[in-house]
From Swiss-Prot:
It comes from the Eukaryota. It catalyses: a primary alcohol + NAD(+) = an aldehyde + NADH + H(+); a secondary alcohol + NAD(+) = a ketone + NADH + H(+); S-(hydroxymethyl)glutathione + NADP(+) = S-formylglutathione + NADPH + H(+); S-(hydroxymethyl)glutathione + NAD(+) = S-formylglutathione + NADH + H(+). GO terms for biological process: formaldehyde catabolic process; heat acclimation; seed development. One of its GO terms (molecular function) is S-(hydroxymethyl)glutathione dehydrogenase (NAD+) activity. Binds 2 Zn(2+) ions per subunit. The lineage of its organism: Eukaryota, Viridiplantae, Streptophyta, Embryophyta, Tracheophyta. It is an enzyme of class 1 (oxidoreductase). It is found in: Cytoplasm. Its cofactor is Zn(2+). This is Alcohol dehydrogenase class-3.
């Protein structure tokens, strides 16, 4: 059914980042109607992720200001542009920063979940059709972010970047499947393919690290070692499947040696969930000679490089990376939502705080406190 606002500019509230590292402000933003191949979504709930903060901090070379950040959200389709067939007004959806067009070289390869169709536009804060933004304030364009821009009551996304989900799913919970939880689960299931009986090490016990633990537990890992410099995280991590804990601050030896000693030669799989290149090296080097695999999940700052001795790889270790946990967004996010509804995966347990969009700056402060996993913001208050 067509909405009353179809084809019209909508004025709504959005959190605008005018410049790097300056508090966001709630503004009245004009959101243009969707063009061909685009979808306008009423965002109901959006969560905060460290990737949003990374761009807001000014360290992201692709960061453009002013912009509307946010990429972990859920909402309802308000209207669709010409040629859009897979979603319609009223559908419940999760915007996906990882597109899936099913037509490009990447999508057709069968080897990756990456998609090349809209990246050239989303990487510079615009839409594909006309290389312009759908957001403006008094005629001044406001850039998009990651093709999602969910810190707004309404957003416009490409149709290849939105997953239709079961309307029974609570949007204030399944919004987390738009990034962090899916990334951690998929790193285990899709990228590493952890087998039953494996020994796993997880560096960094934030939302993504805990989702890795959850995935490893469901895969039947025999030992799941959580590594973090904040010992307060350990009690929470037990609930997600972590079986033992190591705080690097408690040891004089390099952390990789501590883990090798604990595991009779090293772990079968390790996951770096921080984005620290020196920890990435530790994660690789704590893997067992001959077969250990380390997966880089955390996003390092631009320009940083990883290093290790080639001998580490020559002797059988494997170093891999993952984006969105290897999940194909439009095809598999709905499947993850069903797994949640069937109580096969945790999601609610990652939500430690609930606030309103107007409290977004306070929410970002919380993100850096040890007790916060995910803070979910309601946009309609």
């Amino acid at each position: 059914m067509a909405s009353s606002t179809q084809g019209q500019v909508i004025t709504c509230k959005a959190a605008v980042a005018w410049e790097a590292n300056k508090p966001m402000t709630i503004e009245d933003v004009q959101v243009a109607p969707p063009q061909a191949g685009e979808v306008r979504v009423k965002i109901l709930f959006t969560a905060l992720c460290h990737t949003d903060h990374y761009t807001w901090s000014g360290k992201d070379p692709e960061g453009l200001f002013p912009c509307i950040l946010g990429h972990e959200a859920a909402g309802i389709v308000e209207s669709v542009g010409e040629g859009v067939t897979e979603v319609q007004p009223g559908d419940h959806v999760i915007p996906c920063y990882q597109a899936e067009c099913r037509e490009c070289k990447f999508c057709k390869s069968g080897k990756t979940n990456l998609c090349g169709k809209v990246r050239a536009a989303t990487g510079v804060g615009v839409m594909m059709n006309d290389r312009k933004s759908r957001f403006s304030i008094n005629g001044k364009p406001i850039y998009h972010f990651m093709g999602t821009s969910t810190f707004s009551q309404y957003t416009v996304v490409h149709d290849v970047s939105v997953a239709k989900i079961n309307p029974q799913a609570p949007l204030d919970k399944v919004c987390l499947l738009g990034c962090g939880v899916s990334t951690g689960l998929g790193a285990v299931w899709n990228t590493a393919k952890v087998e039953a009986g494996s020994i796993v090490a997880i560096f960094g016990l934030g939302t993504v690290g805990l989702a890795v633990a959850e995935g490893a537990k469901s895969a039947g890992a025999s030992r799941i070692i959580g590594i973090d410099i904040d010992s307060k995280k350990f009690d929470v991590a037990k609930n997600f499947g972590v079986t033992e804990f190591v705080n690097p601050k408690d040891h004089d030896k390099p952390i990789q040696q501590v883990i090798v000693d604990l595991t009779d030669g090293g772990v079968d799989y390790s996951f770096e969930c921080i984005g620290n290149v020196s920890v990435m090296r530790s994660a690789l080097e704590c893997c067992h000679k001959g077969w250990g695999t380390s997966v880089i999940v955390g996003v390092a700052a631009s320009g940083q490089e990883i290093s290790t001795r080639p001998f580490q790889l020559v002797t059988g270790r494997v170093w891999k990376g993952t984006a969105f946990g290897g999940f194909k967004s439009r095809s598999q996010v709905p499947w993850l939502v069903e797994k949640y509804l069937n109580k096969e995966i945790k999601v609610d347990e990652y939500v430690t705080h609930s606030m309103n969009l107007t409290d977004i700056n306070k929410a970002f402060d919380l993100l850096h406190e040890g007790g916060c996993l995910r803070c979910v913001l309601a946009t309609d208050k």
